[in-house]
A protein has these predicted regions:
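Short flexible coil/turn linkers enriched for glycine and charged/polar residues
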Residues: 10-12, 54-56, 67-69, 113, ...
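Functional cores that coordinate and move charged inorganic groups
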Residues: 81, 100-207
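Conserved nucleotide-binding/hydrolysis modules and their immediate coupling elements
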Residues: 1-71
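Active/ligand-binding-proximal structured segments within catalytic/core domains
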Residues: 20-37, 68-119
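Terminal appendage regions of diverse proteins
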Residues: 196, 202-307
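Short beta-strand-to-loop capping motifs
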Residues: 63-65, 121-125, 215-217, 289
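Short, hydrophobic/aliphatic alpha-helical segments
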Residues: 5-22, 70-82, 167-182
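Polybasic, low-complexity association/targeting segments
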Residues: 32-33, 41-49, 125-148, 298-299, ...
Length: 307
């Protein structure tokens, strides 16, 4: 519960600042919470939340309709959305630490605003290092480490072996995952590392002199697996094989297609050559559409001819 401290509207929407809030504002690569505010006015949707001033400003709630100033409200966060964000964020901490341990790869930026998340690394990562990191991150999931957040002063920071230096000054919020990872972070996290799994690396690529790693985690990784498994099952049924042997019939089909394309091209060229003398002699000639392009190329070599 909270009191509405300030409200305003403009051509883009309606806004409110509350005396206190549990709505997480978009920050640190993590999307904002959504949900509802309830009060004497009824119910309005919270569409977005952001900080007026980065790290220390009031949280501004973007609303679906205006509300009066000074009233008491009750907020409800869209919990399924929040939980998925927490899974992404805790999984990112685990994967970033695993990448550091497996290959000495340092995380410089993250994006958690879609089910497919990214971690940007300073170094060019090798396949063996990324795969080892994926396994290590999932071992950390199975270890069921406790996740805890606490604040320390700027002077106390030197006592803590942080994965990366903090970007803020003054009191700093740290997130510790057992004895596996410790990092400065203001985001929302799970209670234990086990809730973040599974963690699946999808791919990685060179990016700005380093590497961008794409991954999914938690329910979203499981949903992705279900979708891909269903697709493989349908394809396996169509090719009368099992999912793990699909590559062979697909490659065979590709080879047959390439061969047919070659034969088709040879037939078009042969027919175009056969029709060329008649096309040069006759004013009008009916030509099969697939051959028209090849015949046109040949006619273009002769002056005064056109299609």
């Amino acid at each position: 519960q909270a009191r509405v401290e300030r409200v305003w509207s403009d051509e883009k929407g309606h806004y409110a600042v509350l005396s206190q809030t549990l709505f997480y504002p978009e920050s640190g690569g993590q999307p904002a919470d959504r949900g509802v505010l309830r009060g004497p006015f009824g119910e309005v949707q919270v569409l977005h939340a952001y900080e007026e001033e980065k790290a220390f400003g009031d949280v501004v709630h973007v609303l679906s309709a205006p509300i009066p100033e000074g009233v008491e409200v009750e907020g409800e966060i869209d919990w399924p959305r929040r939980f998925r964000h927490m899974q992404r964020h805790t999984a990112q901490h685990l994967l970033s630490q695993a990448l550091l341990r497996a290959g000495g790869y340092h995380t410089v930026a993250v994006s958690l605003d879609s089910p497919v998340c990214t971690v940007d690394l300073e170094e060019e990562a090798e396949e063996a290092g990324v795969l080892e990191a994926e396994a290590l991150a999932n071992f950390a999931v199975y270890a069921d480490y406790t996740v805890e957040a606490f604040y320390v002063s700027e002077e106390e920071l030197a006592r803590y072996p942080l994965r990366r230096p903090p970007k803020v000054r003054g009191k700093v919020r740290l997130v510790r995952i057992g004895d596996f990872d410790l990092a400065a972070c203001g985001g929302t996290h799970l209670k234990t590392s086990a809730q973040a799994g599974p963690i699946k690396v999808l791919k990685w690529e060179r990016y700005k002199g380093g590497t961008r790693v794409y991954f999914m985690a938690g329910w979203e990784a499981l949903e992705d697996y279900h979708a891909k498994h269903a697709l493989l099952a349908r394809l396996a049924l169509a090719f009368s094989t099992n999912p793990l042997e699909l590559e062979k019939p697909i490659r065979k089909l590709q080879d047959e297609l390439y061969a047919l394309k070659g034969e088709n091209q040879a037939l078009r060229e042969g027919l175009a050559e056969a029709l060329l003398p008649r096309a040069l002699e006759e004013k009008a000639l009916l030509v099969p559409l697939p051959v028209l392009g090849e015949l046109g190329k040949r006619l273009a070599r002769f002056e005064g001819t056109f299609l």
